């Protein structure tokens, strides 16, 4: 008996919409990352992108536990000397609410070309409106 290996051209990808309102950030991000990788499918193959498309709405209403709302910091470097920039969760959720979920999910995906391809299938929106109605996304309860 041979092991089944999925081929990129035969993979069937579905569209799902996830409502992030009131959901804990980390628990939501792990489920989204798993769906983007395709680990929920029986034909999952590690070196093939078998995941689905995920549309996340209400990113501005995602929840965090404890004191993370004020204490959690996001860091990035500009590339210049002394260019370490930091922003708190509270300020980032006001400024760019999509980036909070995008950063959490991106850190849970593989690093490299395959991980970047998986990340491109994630669409995050701050409010309830999204422009993917033509794809007829199914509601995914997480």
UniProtKB/Swiss-Prot annotation:
Alphabetical keyword list:
Ribonucleoprotein, Ribosomal protein
| Gene3D superfamilies given in the database record | Ribosomal protein L13
* The encoding gene: rplM
Family membership: Belongs to the universal ribosomal protein uL13 family.
User: GO MF annotations for this entry?
Assistant: mRNA binding; structural constituent of ribosome
- Gene Ontology terms describing biological process: negative regulation of translation; translation
What does this protein's UniProt record list under function?
A: This protein is one of the early assembly proteins of the 50S ribosomal subunit, although it is not seen to bind rRNA by itself. It is important during the early stages of 50S assembly.
Name listed for the protein in its UniProt record: Large ribosomal subunit protein uL13
Residue ranges annotated as transmembrane are none
Species name: Photobacterium profundum (strain SS9)
